[in-house]
Amino acid sequence: MRPFRLGLTGSIGMGKSTTAALFAEEGVPVWDADAAVHRLYAPGGALVGPVAALCPAALKGGAVDRGALRDWIAADPTALPRLEALVHPAVAADRAAFLAHARTDIVLLDIPLLYEKGSEAEMDAVLLVTAPPVLQRARVLGRGTMTEAQFEAILARQMPDREKRARATHILETLGLEAARAYVRALIAHIRETADA
């Protein structure tokens, strides 16, 4: 029997990583699209050579430098679609390998661009994590890893939160850790009860 596939999505700064960690604490295997990209870009990763062929400046120390890729994407309007043509099939293959080895009743698939890339059809349900815009902005800019302009550029590429809310099966407002933990536990129990019915 294949596991129940719960997709986890939400815009940047909404609490996806924290929510995924809560599922992992409950014993639910988590596949993370961003982590898959990091593995593929790391030394020896399957995308190092192909990405370096597209953007030689992105090759640093045998790995793909994401900062150099961001600069390339900002400077060349044709860069992102060419990069995605390499990345998305490789990430899909990584996800398929994870699913092929999953021996559990539920898996969580953490996919930031789940709706934008049409992955929702592969899910049994989708959990959207969300937060008020002021909290989202504070979380992202408080990390100190990007500028406000970079944050706005990422938001512009992501589907608006209100559209995601309309499409999601489940919605979690990530306002506090204990409330989120309780929600995750209740959702896991609900999925298991529904599967047993």
UniProtKB/Swiss-Prot annotation:
It is found in: Cytoplasm. Pathway: Cofactor biosynthesis; coenzyme A biosynthesis; CoA from (R)-pantothenate: step 5/5. ATP binds at G13, M14, G15, K16, S17, T18. GO terms for biological process: coenzyme A biosynthetic process. Catalyzes the phosphorylation of the 3'-hydroxyl group of dephosphocoenzyme A to form coenzyme A. InterPro entries: Depp_CoAkinase, P-loop_NTPase. Pfam families: CoaE. Belongs to the CoaE family. This is Dephospho-CoA kinase. NCBIfam families: dephospho-CoA kinase. Its EC number is 2.7.1.24. HAMAP family: Dephospho_CoA_kinase. It catalyses: 3'-dephospho-CoA + ATP = ADP + CoA + H(+). Keywords: ATP-binding, Coenzyme A biosynthesis, Cytoplasm, Kinase, Nucleotide-binding, Transferase. Gene3D superfamilies: P-loop containing nucleotide triphosphate hydrolases (3.40.50.300). The keyword Nucleotidyltransferase does not apply. Residues 5-197 form the DPCK domain. The keyword Acyltransferase does not apply. GO terms for molecular function: ATP binding; dephospho-CoA kinase activity.
